[in-house]
């Protein structure tokens, strides 16, 4: 069977995350980033504004190496691309570069579960230079770890587990008094099991006084849609939540077979959407990569 390849593309939506969560992407003005070269993609966008500049961090992935790095794309106030560079590279695959500000510093918490660890980085010279601060130990090797400071403590939401079903459909939580830890796994972990809405997919936000978390709907395909998980109660001992309907990818683009990031960034919101390549070239690329590795 030909190898199917998910190819993602990032969009900048001129709407706030609360608006999109309420009504979806239909009718929204979306500025799509340029397509990547063949069998490469940018995904998992997160960003910060500084002095009328949008600093957008994303996973840059090439199917020829099957290794993700973190790229930075810088835009001006009119969302014109000014620069692009790789700012974080490790021996292991990196993705989901959750970037945020806290305690007078700028932090990044990229997904790196293939390293069996979660590493917290701090900007030494934003946005280009980052240093390792600590490695966070949790009950599973975390996937798409998503932090937020809420109700006087830090919370961390993540997926993970020994099999694909857990990685797609199990949501865990942990809490800490300080960002650097120690972190305490929630006693009800996994706090949610649902392939249709458990794996984190963007920035948490408040709707009124209710904490909301974008999660991925993976029932039909990986990252098929985004849903909003509302926490009606969240303490170190208890959790009560409800989930909203799927938010679908835009239909007026070839990238309409998936949507798995919804990230607030000031007056704009960052998303990604995918198309699936079914040509069989992915199988040939895999074969060539394995041959190169065997010959090395």
Model-derived features: positions:
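Carbohydrate-active catalytic/glycan-binding domains of CAZyme proteins
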Residues: 1-296
């Amino acid at each position: 069977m030909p190898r199917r390849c998910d190819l993602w593309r990032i969009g900048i939506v001129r709407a706030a995350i609360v608006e999109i969560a309420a009504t979806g992407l239909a009718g929204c003005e979306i500025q799509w980033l340029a397509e990547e070269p063949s069998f490469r993609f940018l995904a998992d966008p997160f960003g910060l504004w500084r002095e009328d500049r949008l600093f957008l961090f994303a996973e840059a992935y090439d199917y020829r190496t099957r290794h993700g790095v973190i790229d930075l794309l810088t835009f001006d106030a009119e969302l014109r691309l000014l620069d692009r560079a790789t700012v974080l590279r490790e021996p292991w695959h990196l993705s989901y570069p959750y970037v945020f500000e806290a305690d007078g510093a700028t932090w990044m918490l990229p997904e790196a579960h293939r390293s069996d660890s979660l590493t917290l980085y701090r900007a030494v010279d934003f946005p280009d230079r980052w240093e390792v601060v600590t490695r966070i130990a949790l009950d599973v090797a975390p996937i798409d770890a998503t932090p937020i400071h809420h109700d006087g403590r830090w919370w961390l939401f993540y997926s993970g587990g020994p099999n694909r079903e857990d990685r797609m459909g199990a949501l865990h939580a942990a809490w800490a008094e300080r960002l650097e830890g120690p972190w305490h796994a929630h006693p009800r972990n996994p706090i949610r099991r649902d392939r249709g809405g458990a794996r984190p997919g963007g920035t948490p936000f408040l709707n009124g006084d209710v904490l909301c978390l974008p999660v991925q709907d993976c029932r039909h395909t990986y990252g098929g849609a985004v849903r909003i998980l509302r926490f009606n109660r969240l303490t170190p001992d208890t959790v009560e939540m409800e989930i909203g309907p799927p938010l679908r990818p835009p239909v007026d683009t070839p990238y309409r077979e998936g949507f798995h990031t919804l990230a607030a960034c000031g007056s704009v919101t960052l998303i990604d959407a995918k198309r699936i390549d079914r040509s069989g070239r992915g199988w040939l690329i895999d074969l060539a990569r394995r041959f190169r590795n065997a010959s090395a």
